[in-house]
């Protein structure tokens, strides 16, 4: 299922990019808590459960709330939740077996399931499009607004 893994991985990466950009916008607004520091944030994103779509979406929503921006639409949140449940650790579609202790491996997919790859790919595409084309655009516009405000302040406007 490499194609499904690639879709899922792209979604994970765009969530991480969104978290990093939202944190950067908060820092530019003057927030100084250590959790927003790029190195600290990278450690957190690479730490425990680094591939959890649910954890990444939760972190993103906390940051969006602090920026007073709209939360992810319920339909997107539901898609992320269902995709997370299907593959909570980013291993289900990547490996045929996963470590289950010292020298022990379990099937990555313990029960056989038939998956409509086309429908699943569409779910990934919809969530990815909202995040990459929608949310990252909103955050980019916010960055431009911050830059305009800074220019105006430096000119005494």
For each feature predicted by the language model, list its residue ranges:
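Domain-scale activation on soluble regions of proteins
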Residues: 1-157
């Amino acid at each position: 299922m490499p194609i499904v893994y690639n879709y899922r991985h792209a979604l994970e990466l765009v969530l991480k990019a969104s978290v990093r950009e939202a944190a950067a916008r908060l820092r530019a607004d003057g927030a100084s808590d250590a959790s927003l520091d790029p190195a600290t944030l990278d450690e957190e994103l690479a730490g425990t459960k680094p591939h959890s779509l649910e954890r990444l979406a939760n972190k993103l929503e906390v940051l969006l709330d602090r920026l007073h921006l709209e939360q992810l639409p319920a339909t997107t949140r539901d898609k992320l939740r269902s995709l997370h449940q299907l593959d909570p650790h980013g291993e289900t579609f990547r490996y045929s077996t996963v470590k289950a202790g010292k020298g022990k491996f379990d099937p990555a997919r313990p029960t056989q399931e038939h998956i409509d790859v086309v429908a699943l790919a569409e779910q990934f595409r919809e969530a990815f499009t909202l995040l990459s084309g929608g949310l990252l655009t909103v955050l980019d516009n916010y960055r431009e607004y911050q830059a305009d405000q800074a220019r105006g302040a430096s000119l005494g406007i």
